[in-house]
Amino acid sequence: MFGFDQIEKIVPLSLQNKQIGISRVAFKKKYSMKDETAQYRVSSGKKVKLSKLPTTYSGKLEKEAGKLKMEEVKLSINKSQEKLYASGNRSLLIIFQAMDAAGKDSAIEHVMSGVNPQGCQVYNFKTPNEEEYAHDFLWRHYRALPEKGRIGIHNRSHYENVLVCKVHPEYILKENIPGYDQVSKIDNDFWKARYESIKSFEQHLTNNGTTVIKIFLHLSKEEQKQRFLDRINDPEKNWKFAGGDLVERKAWEDYQRAYEQAFEETSTESCPWYIIPADKKWYARLMISKIVDNTLKELKLEFPGLEDKELENLSTYKTQLLEEK
């Protein structure tokens, strides 16, 4: 539940009234929030049609109130991450996928800005290099998994191998897989086996203490166009745009179908996908932060305790310090 009693911990009441411009009672009535993230979770075996799912938020929560809520959630994430790091027996892997310009980089920056860098690592996966092509498609992703006690973020991931490679199957030929030396041989059985490999990989991680959550930022084609134009028009954003972005944009529908099948085949109870409306960046960031916060809380993390003998030693050490001359 989101009310003044919670955000007062972050922002003084005087500043809240100034920013939001409504009374305390009106705020509670207007902005009471239940956990919204469940509606964006893809149930195992569920059919997915992206064109029927929202790309924007049209609810009552206003941007400034949402930002205040996010600050509260980030404090909770930070506390949970401290416990995760201290306990050192579990890890969290967060996967981000999206069409170009959906806001993956900025979402990662905003959601994880409050965590201790020692306990968090981010990997951005680009086109595989020669060494990576010489191994199976999961090899480079396995090498980038978070250690116990850490949060790992994969900006793009092993799913590129059933997304980009599905739209451009000629890329599969670079993997030198026996029996697949021609695009015409890459059939439905090939993709089915690849989905199964991904599910087995993620289940293996789960079985060994790594919780996996997968985020898809669902951007509309119209909003992508506007963001591309912003990158072209703003000199400080020119570096973000490449001509190849328009080539991939022409394959929009092919990518939508590839994503839909990936969600249907790989969203499981233990490793779910979340399809988050991304046209409004502030809302997408809030939902992602809540998903991360909820997931960490579900792990029921605690700071490690000490044995009786260790506690006795602490008492001795305390006495020694206090008696120092």
Locate each region found by the language model.
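Conserved nucleotide-sensing/catalytic segment adjacent to the nucleotide-binding pocket
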Residues: 62-64, 120-125, 130-186
